[in-house]
Swiss-Prot record:
Keyword vocabulary terms for this entry: Kelch repeat, Repeat
Domain F-box: 16-66
SMART domains documented for this protein: Kelch
Gene3D superfamilies assigned to the protein according to its UniProt record, in alphabetical order: Kelch-type beta propeller (2.120.10.80)
SUPFAM superfamilies xrefs: F-box domain, Kelch motif
Kelch repeats: 123-170, 172-219
Pfam families in the cross-refs: F-box (PF00646), Kelch_FKB95 (PF25210)
Protein name: Putative F-box/kelch-repeat protein At2g44030
Organism (species): Arabidopsis thaliana
Amino acid sequence: MTTEEDMRSSSSESSPKSFLSLPYDVVFNCLSRVSRTHDPILSLVSKSFRSLLALPDLEAERFRILKNETCLYVCLNLNNNNNPNPSWFILSQTPKHKLIPLPSLPYPDPHPNCSTVVSTGSEIYLLGGFVAKEKRSRRAYVLDCKSHQWRRLPKMRIARKEAAANVIDGKINVYGGCSSEYHNSVNWGEIYDPMTQTWEPFPEGALNKEGVIPCALIKDGIAFPDCGLLISGKVYDTTTMDTLDYNTPMDKLDLCPNVCMLKIDNQDFQASVSDGKLKLVRCRGAMAWHWTVGGLEELSCNYLLSVASPGGGRRVTVWWKTYTKECKTEIWCALILLERELVWGVIEWSENVFTLPGSESDSDSNSFLLHYELVTLARH
């Protein structure tokens, strides 16, 4: 005769075991072999998972096993009623290429528009931008790419939007983006020191333009020599400035959307998306050669919105949207290898990386891929 105690015992034995019920060493060993790109999803499972993922010992073991791991982070304007604010993702490589959502900015802060992004080490900095009533913001945030958590930083000294930024000697240098009252003052730029967590103006008389490189500007297929500036891989239009020299504050920089720089065989190229197609431009002096990349017939039925070259070499990613009959929006990405003297592209992969409800159409390529950063988590 089966007793009630036997039934409870049998039921207990047949119920599925939790992963966390395994010996600690087994759990630790398994998690150490999982790519960091999956951490945002794993952290949602339970508080126990979040605690495990935050362990310094786990990070050390991952560095030992996985060594360097390079991850692409993107900020997209989904322009969807369910996602009205820009959203950050990490692009997972395995088993399929998928965008994994990252946590939002610290509540209740909305994501600013026209902000500036720059990365150093395992951190991504988000600076300034427009907030309520399109006012410039002094706010600054940093994303820890190990824990995938945002935290607030001390506010900048001056409110800015669409500023330029780069990293010099481990410090964040921010240029321009301020109102006209600061255009001719030392406050047109400032420096953030992560060690002291303080903002300081540029030293008087020192414009800190290391890493700011003059480059050609392409408009409607015409090259304008030295009318652009290359800062952290981004191209800025300086044609609205009165003069361009190293004694003039960069107070009127305009970011050129959907343009990325490629360094191939010691030559500079600009990749861009125009009329839904991937195009390349090579500049030499006042001359410019531009062409549409061939070999991409598989993508010809899609209207490309954005291009990014996180590595700066022969590979670029292109992005576009499709809309389904089920009123869903699919975000697609393809990795393209440029070959045959860069006139031909080979599609290494092309996948639907994210699907969201709603099909609010928006083909404005200038406002889709807002930011991207390639972050390498290196073993120290």
